[in-house]
Amino acid sequence: TRRIYHRIMEEDGVDRKPGAEELLKYAKEHGYRLALATSSRELHAQLLLKKYGLFDYFDGAVYGNMVSAGKPDPEIYLKACASIQVLPEFAIALEDAPSGIRSAAAAGMRPVMIPDLVEPDEAVLELVWRRFDTLYDVIDLLESDFQNS
């Protein structure tokens, strides 16, 4: 089953979010340290990141198989921040799912939501620092020097 899954992922994959590469490139060019905090298993995530040419943008990564508790537990975000030596209160987390927003907020980060399949409810929206429609909007946030907001 796993072999079939990996073959399908290699052939069809998943859609890359519009603006992903542009955002990662902008952040790297402007000195941001980037960590990946994904619930996906390491092999699967690396396969997709390499396929889309995004893997090398990240300075650190924590995968679902590296934590004992999944999102909304803050463990994955705390480890991701530690992997790039950034305190959570000085980090933003980009999320498309309510459980990820809860995880980032519990870790003490600034959660930024770009909704995908699941629209956030009121309880999740209270945890969100910023909400955007696309990853391109996050570039605008970085350009505006969000540290002063």
Language-model segments: what does each one mean?
Residues 1-6:
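Short, basic/glycine-rich phosphate-binding loops at helix/coil junctions
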Residues 7-36, 42-46:
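Short, acidic loop-to-helix structural element flanking the phosphoryl-transfer center
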Residues 25, 41-149:
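Asp-based, Mg2+/Mn2+-dependent phosphohydrolase catalytic module
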